A protein has these predicted regions:
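Short alpha-helical elements
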Residues: 1-177
Length: 177
């Protein structure tokens, strides 16, 4: 009886380790199925504020968007596949959250050469932080709108917004509880 329980436990640990390796390679495998290299060289970074319920353990207030809750920070490749992810309370700035996401996932970002960000990531401190984490060869590009109060789809920026839409479509992620 004891031996069977021990074998069962060891088997579960092996399966968990196998699953961990498997999930880490999902993005690379998906990119290879599309005929691309497993590692991306260009990432698009953005953040999204999401409402919390009143009983949630972690929450903050994003004064810019007037949302009480959390903030999701993601860096996706040109196909919309996530390469770096971080979840913070809403008061964390986009720049700090993006640096946290890149720091968490830096081992898988060794071949990245450029980041495309919106105007929320402007500033030399952010660029220096990215270069400290990923290397001096990284270029940070800021996508700017040409006209102040008009809607215009910005090339490549819509990809990260589509990735957020994929997350929102998952009913378990529509509100952080």
């Amino acid at each position: 009886r004891c031996t069977r329980t021990l074998r069962s436990g060891v088997s579960r640990v092996r399966e968990a380790a196998c699953w961990s390796r498997h999930s880490k390679n999902q993005v690379g495998a998906a990119r290879e199925r599309q005929g691309r290299n497993a590692c991306s060289t260009h990432l698009i970074v953005d953040a999204q504020s999401v409402k919390n319920t009143d009983t949630a353990a972690f929450k903050g207030y994003d004064a810019g968007k007037q949302v009480s809750g959390i903030k999701r920070h993601i860096a996706v490749d040109t196909q919309g596949l996530p390469h770096a992810v971080a979840v913070t309370t809403a008061e964390v700035t986009d720049r700090k959250g993006a640096l946290q996401a890149l720091q968490r996932c830096k081992c898988g970002l060794k071949q990245v050469q450029s980041l495309l960000c919106d105007s929320g990531y402007v500033g030399r401190p952010f660029e220096q932080g990215v270069q400290e984490i990923l290397g001096e060869h990284i270029t940070v590009q800021i996508a700017k709108r040409s006209e102040l109060h008009s809607f215009k789809v910005m090339p490549k920026r819509w990809i990260v917004e589509r990735s957020f839409a994929w997350l929102e479509k998952n009913r378990r992620l529509w509100k952080n509880c």
